[in-house]
Amino acid sequence: MPMQGAQRKLLGSLNSTPTATSNLGLAANHTGAPCLEVPIPDGLFLSLGLVSLVENVLVVAAIAKNRNLHSSMYCFICCLAVSDLLVSGSNMLETAIILLLEAGALVTRASVVQQLHNTIDVLTCSSMLCSLCFLGAIAVDRYISIFYALRYHSIMTLPRAQRAIAAIWVASVLSSTLFITYYDHAAVLLCLVVFFLAMLVLMAVLYVHMLARACQHAQGIIRLHKRQPPAHKGFGLRGAATLTILLGIFFLCWGPFFLHLTLVVFCPQHMTCSCIFKNFKVFLTLIICNTIIDPLIYAFRSQELRRTLKEVLLCSRWPGCWAEGGGDSVWPGSCVTLRGPLPP
């Protein structure tokens, strides 16, 4: 097809720099050693993206519907869901367009494909940056709620949270526009890698400090009630396991993508690096998996949000199901307002 080159560009600017891309073929020709390339079927990729879309839409709907969830913490969780939704949605859109172009079902000019390529790349990059930023914002919010509990509501006011959210979105869009425009500069890719490492360090420091404070608090309760020390040790182990899972999932899902960017800068012509470049779609799939896991970690653990989500799902069958205000709901044909969990 005459547009094959333009179609391939939809795979994303961050896949590799032009230098790296041009040398991948040479590396493969000079060495007969096979590369480990993990194929990701388009159907699987689109299915994971769809699961992420549905999951995060439900989180946004539940938070928007229940006024009890209109706090700074849930605002950050809602924005994390929106950014994760955009991450999965933009990658699904890109994959769908490529499949349509390759199948000949979508015929358009190369200039239009190029505009789509630029738009989707900016959307993907900005949503990724937002997702990382809101993960950091949630960590900061929880840190303040623990170490400044008495002043929390005066520090983390809703207007301040809204200003922080607006600043994150604006900064992410502007930064991603610059990153995509100058993606072939090594400094741009290094900035992205440094930003990821900064978020990782920030989250690790804050959550480790929170775990230490929780262990101290548990130890104080044990001494007060004169209980046996093993109970405190068990609490510390559970907390350490939870922290390891939280940070481990974050690193495993995001780390390979930023490792890819690092290798693009430092070893674009190395044979081993060229093999890693071939698994770029695997790294994107891991990020999609992270957008599926985020609601399970940050949203669905809230009993209030789960209750509201249950109401949203049950009341979706009747347009007039919801009563005005809060998360209260009214069954159709009844004047009884349910303020507790809905019956199964």
UniProtKB/Swiss-Prot annotation:
Record flagged with keyword Hydrolase: no
- Membrane side Extracellular: residue ranges: 1-37, 94-118, 184-191, 267-279
Keyword list (alphabetical) reads: Cell membrane, G-protein coupled receptor, Glycoprotein, Lipoprotein, Membrane, Palmitate, Receptor, Transducer, Transmembrane, Transmembrane helix
- Residues on the membrane's Cytoplasmic side span 64-72, 141-163, 212-240, 301-344
Covalent lipid sites (S-palmitoyl cysteine): C315
Q: Where are the transmembrane segments?
A: 38-63, 73-93, 119-140, 164-183, 192-211, 241-266, 280-300
PROSITE patterns reported for this sequence: G_PROTEIN_RECEP_F1_1, G_PROTEIN_RECEP_F1_2
Q: What is its main location?
A: membrane
Q: Which GO terms describe its molecular function?
A: melanocyte-stimulating hormone receptor activity
Entry's localization field: Cell membrane
Lipid bilayer topology: Multi-pass membrane protein
Q: Which Pfam family, any one, appears in the UniProt record? A: 7tm_1
Task: Glycosylated residues: list them.
Answer: N29
What do the Gene Ontology cellular component annotations say? plasma membrane
Biological process annotations from GO = adenylate cyclase-activating G protein-coupled receptor signaling pathway
Per the entry, what this protein does is: Receptor for MSH (alpha, beta and gamma) and ACTH. The activity of this receptor is mediated by G proteins which activate adenylate cyclase. Mediates melanogenesis, the production of eumelanin (black/brown) and phaeomelanin (red/yellow), via regulation of cAMP signaling in melanocytes.
Description of how the protein assembles with itself and partners: Interacts with MGRN1, but does not undergo MGRN1-mediated ubiquitination; this interaction competes with GNAS-binding and thus inhibits agonist-induced cAMP production. Interacts with OPN3; the interaction results in a decrease in MC1R-mediated cAMP signaling and ultimately a decrease in melanin production in melanocytes.
Task: Give the family this protein belongs to, as stated in its UniProt record.
Answer: Belongs to the G-protein coupled receptor 1 family.
Q: What is this protein called?
A: Melanocyte-stimulating hormone receptor
Question: Which source organism?
Answer: Callimico goeldii
